[in-house]
Amino acid sequence: MANRGGCVTVAAEEMDELRRRNIELSREVAEMKTEMIKLWQRTVVAEEAEEQLCSQLAELEVESLEQARDYHDRMLFLMDQISRLSSSSVVSSS
């Protein structure tokens, strides 16, 4: 009978250890859930920031393209003016 009592004691100790471990694991799971929620929230913020930056970049690309076209048009205009002035000065010199 002593052995049975010993088995019962061991089983009770094992149960207590399993309960403690279960509580510990439950706490760890709760902490991990909290951390996961924080990471998810940061991910959402980062995605929103990325979208905003992409939008701003697209606007800047459009603006720079417009400026490049304006610059190109201005260069063509000035080259035409120089060409006209050069040809008119040649005609005037003759």
Swiss-Prot record:
GO biological process: cellular oxidant detoxification; cellular response to sulfur starvation; response to salt stress
Coiled-coil blocks: 8-35
Pfam families assigned to the protein according to its UniProt record, in alphabetical order: LSU
InterPro entries found in the cross-reference section: LSU (IPR039282)
KW Coiled coil (keyword) present: yes
Taxonomic superkingdom: Eukaryota
Keyword Ligase set for record: no
Induction and repression of expression: By stressful environmental conditions such as salt stress, AgNO(3), and sulfur deficiency.
Record keywords, A-Z: Coiled coil
Name recorded for this polypeptide: Protein RESPONSE TO LOW SULFUR 1
Gene name of the encoded protein: LSU1
